[in-house]
Amino acid sequence: MKQYFMGIDIGTYESRGMLIGEDFRVTAEHTVAHGMSHPRQGWFEHDADKVWWGDFCGISRHLIEAGGIAPEQISCIGASTLGTDCLLGCDCVPVDEHCRPLCKAILYGIDSRADKEIQWLTRHYGRDVRRLFGHPICSGDTATKILWIKNNEPEVYRRTYKFLTGSSFITAKLTGR
């Protein structure tokens, strides 16, 4: 039975996927646009279930159908998500023990709600962070988002089992862990 590789990228404004055969030829491609929530000045969010997981599942179904293959023929899945580079930072979503998002995901460095938390972290850890990571604390750092949730959404923080990036969220949904 011929095997296939599937890759899906969840981006800021769209998600795209590709199914590639053993011969490294593209069997199917699919792209879907999605929105981004901007509820307040400087805030940028995604609904992790709807956008990240929903797009992942929808694109997967489309690729399998368009490729005319059985799901069992997929031997490898690669997933990438928005804002996971060093320059822009990571997105962050708090989840409960069943991987259910407790609020909207805070996007990578484009979300600037955590200014007070950046200042606090810089006062307390700035010198060490710059030495260890080569850059000052910024809005893209996951720690700023976690501290913002702790300070501004204490009930969400209290109920949080884990804070996940987009890639971690997709992995947790796929594996159940």
Regions found by a protein language model. Name each.
Residues 1-104, 131, 159:
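N-terminal glycine/serine-rich phosphate-binding loop of ATP-dependent small-molecule kinases
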Residues 94, 116-120:
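Pocket-flanking alpha-helical
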Residues 45, 120-125, 177:
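Short, surface-exposed amphipathic charged segments that create phosphate/polyanion-binding patches used
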Residues 2, 10-12, 88-89, 95-98, ...:
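Gly/Ser/Thr-rich active-site cleft segment
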Residues 111:
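Carbohydrate-associated surface elements
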Residues 56, 114, 142:
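Conserved donor sugar-nucleotide recognition element shared by glycan-biosynthetic enzymes
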